[in-house]
A protein has these predicted regions:
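Feature marking well-ordered beta-strand scaffolds used for ligand recognition
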Residues: 1-144
């Protein structure tokens, strides 16, 4: 972000995300910390995924809190909460174990795998001013 390298470790114990800068000498310095709440749903964070889209850097955090959160990096390394997707009956995002992000045709496609529910979650993220997400659920048959 703006030529600066950042590291975002998650603490499952404290339910927080911490943003650290990494300078050329390898020294880490704290920049920001975000605590989980019912509005963010990354308690016990186990999975983080980062990506860039149209010049912006993003982080997705998921844990054992039945959902995931999308954050954008500000120019000074602060995490700006954009959206949270909470688990519902038709979205297998409880206890997410893996996240995959791909940019297809300019759209951000987010795929999730749950450790406790069948299926693959598929979300199309709209990173416009509304920063909302649309969800689809894809189910795979067990072939052996």
């Amino acid at each position: 972000v703006q030529g600066q390298s950042y590291i975002v470790p998650a603490s499952a114990g404290t339910g927080s995300l911490t943003v650290l800068t990494l300078d050329s000498a390898g020294v880490l310095s704290p920049v920001d910390q975000v605590a989980d709440s019912l509005n963010t749903r990354f308690q016990g964070a186990q999975v983080l995924e980062s990506f860039t889209h149209q010049g912006n850097a993003y982080v997705i955090a998921a844990g054992q809190d039945s959902g995931l959160s999308l954050f954008r990096f500000s120019d000074d390394g602060q995490l700006v909460h954009l959206d949270t997707i909470a688990d519902q009956l038709n979205t297998p995002i409880n206890s997410i174990t893996d996240i995959y992000v791909d940019i297809i045709g300019g759209d951000v496609q987010l795929f999730t795998v749950s450790g406790s529910e069948a299926g693959i979650g598929h979300f199309t993220l709209s990173l416009s001013t509304t920063s909302s997400a649309q969800a689809d659920v894809l189910f795979a048959q067990d072939t052996g």
